[in-house]
Structure formats: C-alpha cells, structure tokens
C-alpha cells in the first residue's frame, strides 16, 4: 500500500470510528432515558410515522440495507476480467512480440530488416485478450445479475405502526429510524430498537455476542453499561425473537446498526467454501505444473535450437496453453445456470456455492408438517373431557388464539376459522372478539409448549385461558371439568384423558389440551408462575391430511440416493400414523427423552437406522443433524419454524420455504417457493447436473493440459525447430476454450444424477495421470509422420530437415526450411485441435460417446465448429500469414484413423479407470 492509499485507509477508518461512536451514543441515550424522551428525540410517537416523517427519516439516517458484500464497480469488474495472471502472460507475450516482430525490424536491429516487420502476432494476441476478457466479463455479469434477481424473489418483512396506529407489513429494507415495530416469536430483529413494551420477550444474540442462552428484554430504563450489548432494553439487528412479543422503536438502521458496522467492517469478497477452495486447489496444481514445465521447455529449446529469443517466446506460449484461464468463468457460468434452472423448479438459491452441496445431499432431515402433510390444518373436533363436542371448549380456544400476539401458527388459524364457521349456528360464539378484551399474555415457548392469554368480559370477569401439548397441560392442571362440575384431576381421570388422546393420535389427529382459570390474582404482571391450579376443560383434535405426492417424492428421493428422516416436535403416535399413511417405512423411532439418555457415540450408531425422531426440542434437532454429519453424511435440513433454525445452521445445507418465519429464511441456503418434497427432489437433480458439468470441465482441462506437457517437452528436446509458433499455441488455446463455453449447458447421464456426488479434489489428480498422457501417444505419432513422411514427401523431395543444408543453400535453404516447418506445424496444429476437442466427448460420459450418450446441441455445435475453423485455417490467407503451409489430402487419410484410434484408446482407458475407481467424474 502506497502513502496515498494508506492516508485514505486511515481517514476512512477514523470516519467509521466517529460514526460508530455516534451510533453508540444514540443507543446509550435510548437505553438510559424514559420512553417519552426517546420518542421525542427520534421525532416519532406511538401512533407511528406519517409519510412525511418516513421521508425525512430516510433522508437523514439512510436505508435499512446492510453491506454484507461490497458490490464491485463496473471498473473493478472490468479490471477483474482483464487483469489476471493469465492475461498478464498474454500482455507479456504481446510486448515481447512487439519488440521482436516490429521494433527490431523497424530499427534494423539484431539482423532484422524492415521486410521482417510483422504486426499480425501482436494483433492476434491483443484480440485474444479482448475476446477472453470480454467473455469472462459478460458471463460474470450475467451470473451476478441472475443471483440478484433470485434473491429479490425472497422477501423478508416486518410489521410497523404507521399513520395513526395502522399496522402495515413492509419490506425490512424500507424500515426507518423512528418506526414503531411489532415483534413476535420467530421474527428477526429488523434494526437496532429500543423496547417500548414487552411480554416475556427472550432474544437470541448468539450471532452478535456468541452467547448461546436467550436474553430477556424489557422496557425498563437502564443505567449506563460498559458494553452496548449489555442493555436489556435494546434489541439488535441480527438477533431473533425466541419467545414472547414486544413493541419497539427503531433507533439505528442499516450499516449504522451494531450488526451493520460489524458486517461492513468485514465486507468484501465472499468467503471461500470447501468447493471453491477445491476448485482453486486444482487451478494451482495446473499452474505449478506450468511453472515447472516452462523453464524446462525454455532451456531445452534454447540449448537444442540456439535461438533463445524464440525459446523464450515459445516458453511463454506454453505457459498460456497449460494454464486453465477459463476455469473461473466456466465454474461461475455453471453455478449461475444451475441457479436459474433451479428457480424454474420453484427453488431459489441464496448462495451459488451451495448448489454443489445441494446435489451432494444423501440424508434429508425434515419436519413432518407441510412435508408429509398438506400444511392445511383443520380443527375436526373440540371435545370435553368425556370426548363429546362442546362449544364451550371451542369458545375458550378462540379466546386464546384470537388474542395472542405471538407467531400465529396453522392451528390458531384453524381454531379461528372453525369458530367463524359455527357462529351462525351457535349464538355463544358470536362477537367474541368484541365482547372480550385482552388483559395480558404469556407467550409460547418450546420448553413449556403452551400459550396463555388473559381476557376480560364486559361484566368484568377475568379468565386465564391456556392451550398446549397434552402432557405439558396436565402438569399445570389440578382440576378437570366433568358432568358434575369441577373435580380434582385424579389419576383415574388423567388415565381416561390420556386414553382418549391416544385413540385420537392413533387416527392421525394432533391433539392440544385447553384449560382455564377464573379471576386469577397474579402478584404483579402475569407470568409463567401463574400457570398453575388450572381447570382442564377439554381438547382440540386437528387433522393435517397427508400429501398424495409424498410417497412418490420419498421414493424418488430414495431412487436418487437420498434417505429421508423425519425430525419433529410432534408426539410419536401421530407421527407414526402419518408415516404409515404416506408409505414411509419406520424401522426405528427415537423420542427426545431417549436422546437425553444417549451419549453422542450411542446416538451416532442409532441414528443410522432410525427413520423418525419425535418429540424433539430445537436443540435436539440440531444435535441429530450434527451427529449425522459427523458420521460422514452430507445432511440437508428442511424447516420453516423458529424451532428449525438451529438444525438448519447445523446442516450442510439449510432448506426453507418462502412462507417461513424470518429466522428460518435467514438460516437457509436454499428457499423453496413451494413446500413439497417433489420440488426438493427436482432441485437436488439440478444441483447434481451443475456439479457434473463443472467437474467435466475441470477434469478435461487437467487431463488435456497434463498430456500437452509431455508432448511439448518431447518436441522441444527432439525436434530441430519449434513444433508450433507461440501465436499458434495461443490461437489454438483460445479456440479450444471458446468451444468449452457451452459445457454448462451439456446433457448429464441419468446414471450420474442417480446418487449423491461429493466434491473430491483428489480424484482430479488420478484422472489427470490416467487420461492425460493418452493424447501424447498420438502427438508423438503425428511428429513422426509429419517429420519423416509428409514434409519430406510433399515439401523437400524426400529430404529430411536436418539434411536440407546439404541440398540447398542461401535463400533457397531458408525458403525450404520455412516450407518444411510450416507444414509440420500445420499438421500438429490440426491434430491437436481434433484430439483436444473430441476428447471432450470422450470424457463427458463413461458411456460410448455419440452412441450411448450424446452431448447437448450447443456443445456439439461449438466443438465441431472449432474443429472446422482450425482445420481450414492452413488453407487460407490467414494461415499463410501465420506461417502455415497447406496440408496434403493424404494427411487426412492419416488423421482420421489416428483420431479414431485415439478415441478407442481413450474409451478403453476410461473404462479401466471406472473399473478401478468406481466412477469417471
């Protein structure tokens, strides 16, 4: 870094420090002052901002967008496409060619004359730089645009009060300082906010502080703290609501939040994944080969030919030919094309590099709801303790579901819908929302597994209404409502209740219990401690019908090597019944209580043969996923609830749906627009196709370059002249690379996508060693035929190159040598293109190419066009300018059998490789 850049960096760092200090002061003011003062300072009220206030706040404080990765400017993207080690080599070659082919002849230096002036080489090299750079720029721009469009399809929203207490749902990016936001379980905190009102609000700040335990947030004014994260009345962007609900006012947005300052401080290029590291490792292996080969070729050519300048030019050309300059572009194009294809299958990719992991999944862990079932919950029965339909049970359930302000799940919606359907037939259900007012609420959490609302009617009677999982409800009930009124909840009554519930579970119903307590008298605010001595009044039986497509989807996943495991919080009986209905064979089932008594080693053994895990907590789901990964599996977890977020983060790839809670979407790598296993199966197939085409190019490039090394080394040592001019090698390399650009659109054999594919960089090395040298055999054969047969026969009248000096002299000798070399170079030029290009069709499939497996039309068209262009060049004026001599017809009588033999040998080696290693790609 120079002095000017250093000064700029120091100034920018100082500016960021000043900005962060200002934000800290704003947060400190909000935390340590009464709510009234905070609202006044932010120029807002509890009624929310009006449009003018929103505009003013946005103009003053900016948008709520966080800089996760710095987007490159057009200039930087152009520089990235044109300025890299590969184009640097080309520029170096262009400079040297300018000096030797233009400057020296112009100045008549080192024996050159003005007649030797030639700008063709320089023009071709610069044209190649332009074409390759432009191609890479266009493809990378398209990839970036495709990724942005896909991400734009995923919307994360928040609920705010605006314009006279009207609640509206807005995109999180549109949030401004002073907005009044409403938070509930499952929400991501949309900005740095000051809590105004909260009910049992617990927030996870693990992403900011590393603290795993949720922290309770309250609206109470705080004393000054050493660290802003210690304030219990401030919730920060990047954290999420674990349980409870709250109203808050936005203090800081976007990059000015604590999370934003951390994200922008480390923003830059995307972090390398294991896949990108593997691709880079292959690139560096090839570059190291090149770095070893180029000096060898340079010294051998210089010593044997005596022309060190030509040797230097040839060495640089070899460097270009052996370097996989198109690899980054091909990989990027494959990923972008895969992402677009997956979007057509209702699958949105948040991170392009996760596509490879998606195709590698061999175990899919998923919740039952919405996956095995239709995610259309219907309240079938509202039963009293005797098992009879009872309107009073439905009425209490409605009061609980309607007035709760946390995450509204499908069962709450089913209760409200059922009440609205039956209110016309039963006057006791009319106008419940108007006849009662909410007093308080104890939100749901996954430890208690129940939710409580406190309501009051117009006569002043207060009721605490609680609903939740049956066992957890029984633990807080001491009475039950029977025929003769309220009775103690004896063991006999408890057994009768559990039997009724078991019968419903066996039929596939999900059952919740409902209880109430009249005129409760809490000490202070209502809390969990008040959930006691309640009266059980009945239960609610819900049906979530199984999906008709589930059985086919699970079979399709199994046919593609993916084992489905169910990880659910529901009880075992309901889960077993649903699995039976959809045709999912349950070999073994483990409950959350079983996991608590198992060591990691015991669970690792049991998990392999267990198809269903039931009654799991969120942490237990994450533990199962982690254990399966430690067993060597690539694990995907599909979920949409707050209880799934931990497991999604623990998985190799998290999968969610567009309707999921914020924290689930934030944790996901892949988002489905439709929660269906069949959609997921199609996405996995697209992931495998994408990986297949990437690994094809990587192995093609590696093996082809490795074979070329042997050919060039032998030619440098044995021939009295260069086997190809530097410009020939560069031009050949460009046309070959252009013919490979269609590989992302190639067909993939059904057998390849039938099972998971893990990225394995080590397989590239073995493939390179097995397949690469094959082409060298036929290169050597071409050397022999061109040097000893075709050139003497059609150029020098039967005289070999080394004997020309004995038969010719002066200008005649120079002309004859140029003709001899021109035909030799044309012969190897054409043979190289044929062998190098046709091997694409050999390597792309373990089957017989053109017969059992055909490449896509774009691949076939580009490769054949490349062959045709380079075959014709020696017969054109352009070829003459390059120094080529037209090839005789007899050459093609040799070339065609030679290439056919090459294809036969390559196919045989390919079969042997598959027998030895089990697979080709």
Feature map (PLM): residue ranges:
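Membrane-embedded transport module
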Residues: 297, 328, 337, 582, ...
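Hydrophobic alpha-helical transmembrane segments
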Residues: 115-116, 121-155, 162, 270-366, ...
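Helix-interface capping motifs at the ends of transmembrane segments in multi-pass membrane proteins
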Residues: 92-124, 285-323, 336, 340-346, ...
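Alpha-helical transmembrane segments of multi-pass membrane proteins
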Residues: 83-108, 125-133, 155-156, 284-302, ...
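Non-lumenal N-terminal regulatory segments of integral membrane proteins
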Residues: 1-167, 173-176, 181-189, 194-202, ...
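Cytosolic catalytic regions of ATP/NTP-dependent phosphoryl-transfer enzymes
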Residues: 234-242, 357-535, 542, 555, ...
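Basic, amphipathic juxtamembrane/active-site segments
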Residues: 202, 208, 219, 374-396, ...
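Soluble-to-membrane junctions at the N-terminal ends of transmembrane alpha-helices
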Residues: 63-95, 144, 159, 165-167, ...
């Amino acid at each position: 870094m120079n002095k000017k850049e250093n000064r700029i960096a120091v100034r920018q760092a100082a500016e960021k420090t000043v900005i962060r200090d200002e934000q800290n002061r704003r947060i400190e003011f909000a935390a340590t002052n009464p709510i009234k003062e905070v609202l006044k300072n932010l120029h807002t009220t509890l009624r929310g901002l009006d449009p003018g206030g929103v505009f003013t706040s946005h103009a003053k404080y900016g948008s709520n967008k966080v800089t996760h990765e710095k987007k490159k400017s057009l200039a930087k993207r152009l520089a990235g496409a044109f300025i890299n080690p590969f184009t640097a080599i080309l520029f170096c070659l262009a400079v040297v060619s300018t000096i030797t082919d233009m400057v020296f002849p112009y100045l008549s230096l080192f024996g050159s004359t003005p007649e030797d002036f030639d700008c063709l080489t320089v023009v071709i090299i610069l044209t190649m730089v332009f074409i390759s750079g432009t191609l890479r720029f266009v493809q990378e721009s398209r990839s970036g645009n495709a990724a942005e469009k896909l991400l734009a399809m995923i919307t994360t929203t928040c609920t705010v009060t605006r314009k006279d207490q009207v609640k509206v749902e807005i995109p999180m990016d549109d949030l401004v300082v002073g907005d009044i936001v409403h938070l509930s379980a499952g929400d991501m905190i949309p900005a740095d906010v000051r809590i105004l009102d909260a009910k049992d609000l617990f927030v996870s700040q693990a992403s900011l502080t590393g603290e795993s335990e949720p922290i309770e947030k309250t609206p109470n004014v705080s004393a000054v703290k050493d660290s802003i994260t210690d304030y219990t009345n401030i919730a920060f962007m990047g954290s999420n609501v674990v349980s409870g609900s709250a109203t808050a006012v936005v203090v800081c947005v976007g990059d000015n939040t604590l999370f934003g300052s951390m994200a922008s401080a480390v923003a830059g290029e995307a972090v390398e994944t294991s896949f990108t590291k593997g691709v880079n490792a292959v690139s560096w292996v090839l570059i190291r080969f090149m770095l070893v080969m180029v000096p060898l070729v340079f010294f051998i050519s210089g010593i044997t030919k005596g022309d060190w300048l030509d040797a230097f030019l040839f060495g640089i050309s070899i460097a270009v030919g052996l370097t996989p300059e198109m690899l980054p572009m091909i990989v990027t194009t494959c990923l972008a094309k895969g992402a677009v294809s997956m979007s057509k299958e209702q699958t949105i990719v948040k991170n392009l590099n996760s596509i490879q992991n998606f195709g590698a999944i061999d175990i899919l862990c998923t919740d039952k709801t919405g996956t095995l079932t239709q995610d259309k919950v219907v309240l079938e029965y509202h039963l009293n303790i005797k098992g009879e339909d009872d309107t009073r049970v439905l009425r209490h359930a409605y009061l609980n579901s309607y007035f709760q302000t946390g995450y509204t799940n499908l069962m709450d919606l089913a209760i409200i819908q059922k009440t609205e359907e039956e209110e016309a037939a039963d006057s006791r259900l009319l106008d419940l929302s108007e006849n009662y007012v909410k007093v308080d609420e104890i939100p749901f959490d996954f430890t208690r597994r129940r939710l409580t609302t406190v309501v009051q009617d117009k006569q002043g009677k207060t009721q605490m209404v609680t609903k939740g999982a049956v066992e957890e409800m029984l633990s807080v009930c001491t009475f039950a409502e029977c025929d003769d009124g309220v009775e103690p909840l004896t063991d006999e009554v408890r057994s009768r209740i559990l039997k009724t519930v078991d019968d419903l579970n066996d039929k596939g119903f999900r059952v919740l219990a409902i209880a109430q307590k009249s005129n409760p008298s809490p000490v202070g605010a209502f809390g969990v401690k008040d959930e006691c001595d309640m009266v059980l009044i009945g239960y609610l039986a819900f049906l979530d019908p199984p999906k008709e497509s589930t059985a086919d989807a699970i079979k399709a996943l199994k046919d593609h090597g993916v084992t489905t495991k169910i990880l659910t919080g529901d009880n075992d009986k309901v889960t077993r019944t649903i699995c039976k209905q959809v045709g999912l064979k349950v070999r073994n089932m483990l409950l959350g209580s079983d996991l608590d008594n198992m060591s990691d080693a015991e669970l690792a053994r049991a998990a392999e043969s267990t198809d269903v895990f039931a009654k799991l907590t969120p942490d237990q789901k994450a533990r199962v996923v982690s254990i399966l990964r430690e067993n060597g599996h690539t694990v995907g977890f599909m979920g949409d609830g707050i209880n799934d977020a931990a497991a999604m983060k623990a998985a190799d790839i998290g999968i969610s749906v567009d309707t999921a809670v914020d924290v689930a979407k934030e944790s996901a790598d892949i988002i489905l627009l439709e929660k269906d296993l069949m959609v997921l199966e199609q996405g996995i197939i697209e992931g495998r196709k994408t990986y297949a085409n990437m690994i094809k190019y990587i192995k093609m490039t590696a093996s082809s370059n490795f074979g070329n090394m042997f050919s060039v080394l032998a030619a440098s040592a044995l021939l009295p002249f260069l086997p190809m001019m530097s410009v020939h090698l560069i031009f050949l390399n460009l046309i070959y690379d252009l013919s490979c650009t269609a590989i992302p659109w190639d067909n993939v054999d059904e057998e390849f996508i039938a099972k998971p594919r893990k990225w394995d960089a080590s397989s590239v090395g073995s493939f390179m060693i097995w397949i690469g040298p094959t082409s060298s055999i036929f290169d050597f054969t071409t050397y022999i035929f061109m040097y000893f047969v075709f050139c003497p026969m059609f150029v020098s009248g039967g005289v070999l190159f080394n004997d020309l000096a004995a038969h010719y002299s002066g200008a005649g000798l120079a002309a004859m040598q140029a003709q001899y070399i021109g035909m030799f170079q044309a012969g190897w030029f054409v043979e190289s293109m044929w062998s190098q290009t046709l091997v694409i069709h050999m390597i792309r499939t373990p089957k017989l190419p053109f017969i059992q497996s055909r490449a896509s039309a774009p691949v076939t068209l580009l490769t054949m066009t490349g062959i045709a262009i380079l075959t014709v060049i020696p017969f054109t004026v352009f070829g003459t300018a390059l120094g080529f001599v037209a090839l005789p017809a007899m050459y093609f009588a040799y070339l065609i059998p030679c290439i056919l033999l090459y294809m036969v040998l390559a196919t045989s080696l390919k079969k042997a490789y598959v027998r030895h290693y089990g697979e080709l790609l």
